[in-house]
Amino acid sequence: DILAAFRVTPQPGVPPEEAGAAVAAESSTGTWTTVWTDGLTSLDRYKGRCYHIEPVAGEESQFIAYVAYPLDLFEEGSVTNMFTSIVGNVFGFKALRALRLEDLRIPPAYVKTFQGPPHGIQVERDKLNKYGRPLLGCTIKPKLGLSAKNYGRAVYECLRGGLDFTKDDENVNSQPFMRWRDRFLFCAEALYKAQAETGEIKGHYLNATAGTCEEMIKRAVFARELGVPIVMHDYLTGGFTANTSLAHYCRDNGLLLHIHRAMHAVIDRQKNHGIHFRVLAKALRMSGGDHIHSGTVVGKLEGEREITLGFVDLLRDDFIEKDRSRGIYFTQDWVSLPGVLPVASGGIHVWHMPALTEIFGDDSVLQFGGGTLGHPWGNAPGAVANRVALEACVQARNEGRDLAREGNEIIREASKWSPELAAACEVWKEIKFEFEAMDTL
């Protein structure tokens, strides 16, 4: 069975058992009345069952309802169908004040019907020939308004300075100021120039997201013809059907696939209603993507440490034990489905590097947009500063130093012999984003 954990807030006067049973019925075989065609099938075989209810600690009228769905209710290899069944109608139920899907357990038999990520973590490292450290990226800013030629120039400067990747922002598609084909050409030129100068393999996430699946695949085909290593997709705004189609194309044609989670906070930000991001992350691993944005813990975007690390492990590891302290409601066995690299992005700069290296470890992408392009000397020195800071943190960690405690000191030491890093340290020494996380356990 697929198991689901729902956070249920019933209307006053509705007992939790009734609310849990209503959720199970509405998201499987039930309707509001008895119908004569019920007799033509075995409802016992197909209905969802609410098998356990527990109160939420510290909340007066909230309960966790556990529901089991028989596997026969779902089409194989279709995240779209899985979500249509489990969260399709039930969230508008009048008997509930609010409903949130906290976690899913996907059984191995169902996991096996998905291709998953086009390549996965190890194949990506082999393609890029980069080992033993997190990968470094940068989102090109301003996100909208640059011409293709100036955009390509910014890409080249960042890659030449020492970054592994640069990135289209999620809303860069094909607008009047910069058509997609022009952008692809100038970015490919920047890639090859930077590769020739540095001797390292470089990538730029070319955003293939489009208004139709056919147009999206057309853009991915053009990227492949240019010989670039990676394309990008906005998986929630583009939809799971489009995402899975692109993931299959990427595996067949040797392209890596970077996934942006634009629109996720509309779905996952409210604590008592919606879908938790750990569910969206699991769905993405099934649908397919080699990278996905996962929050930073330390930057400008929402994300509490233990909860973030919970779904980061769900993205990367093959087997994850149930651990309620990290918000993981079920043990999940991915039966060797390739892993996804978490991408830390949003309001981070060189002073965050020790914390990011310690929190996310080697299998991650650390993405500094403003933290590269905001360097007072320009893009390339900004990239140099980030690369020096990262190499210093990785070396210190490998020597057994405690990054959490000695992080600032490690960065200061490195800045003595890197003027680029020293300038970056000076610019961002006072910048903090300190707000309480909304998403707590």
From Swiss-Prot:
Cofactor: Mg(2+)
Any one GO molecular-function label of the UniProt entry: monooxygenase activity
Binding of Mg(2+), residues: K167, D169, E170
Modifications made to the protein after synthesis: The disulfide bond which can form in the large chain dimeric partners within the hexadecamer appears to be associated with oxidative stress and protein turnover.
Known catalytic reactions: 2 (2R)-3-phosphoglycerate + 2 H(+) = D-ribulose 1,5-bisphosphate + CO2 + H2O; D-ribulose 1,5-bisphosphate + O2 = 2-phosphoglycolate + (2R)-3-phosphoglycerate + 2 H(+)
Origin: domain of life: Eukaryota
Pfam families: RuBisCO_large (PF00016), RuBisCO_large_N (PF02788)
EC class of the enzyme, as a word: lyase
Keywords in alphabetical order: Calvin cycle, Carbon dioxide fixation, Chloroplast, Disulfide bond, Lyase, Magnesium, Metal-binding, Monooxygenase, Oxidoreductase, Photorespiration, Photosynthesis, Plastid
SUPFAM superfamilies the record matches: RuBisCo, C-terminal domain, RuBisCO, large subunit, small (N-terminal) domain
Location within or outside the cell: Plastid, Chloroplast
Sites of N6-carboxylysine modification: K167
Example of a GO biological process term: photorespiration
Site (described: Transition state stabilizer): K300
Active site per UniProt: K141 (proton acceptor), H260 (proton acceptor)
A Gene Ontology cellular-component term: chloroplast
Positions of substrate binding: N89, T139, K143, R261, H293, S345
Keyword Magnesium: yes
InterPro entries per UniProt: RuBisCO, RuBisCo_large_chain_AS, RuBisCO_lsu_C, RuBisCO_lsu_C_sf, RuBisCO_lsu_fd_N, RuBisCO_lsu_N_sf, RuBisCO_lsuI
EC number: 4.1.1.39
Entry similarity comment: Belongs to the RuBisCO large chain family. Type I subfamily.
Function recorded in the entry: RuBisCO catalyzes two reactions: the carboxylation of D-ribulose 1,5-bisphosphate, the primary event in carbon dioxide fixation, as well as the oxidative fragmentation of the pentose substrate in the photorespiration process. Both reactions occur simultaneously and in competition at the same active site.
Subunit structure and binding partners: Heterohexadecamer of 8 large chains and 8 small chains; disulfide-linked. The disulfide link is formed within the large subunit homodimers.
Further remark: The basic functional RuBisCO is composed of a large chain homodimer in a 'head-to-tail' conformation. In form I RuBisCO this homodimer is arranged in a barrel-like tetramer with the small subunits forming a tetrameric 'cap' on each end of the 'barrel'.
Protein name per Swiss-Prot or TrEMBL: Ribulose bisphosphate carboxylase large chain
Organism for this UniProt entry: Polemonium reptans (Greek valerian)
Gene: rbcL
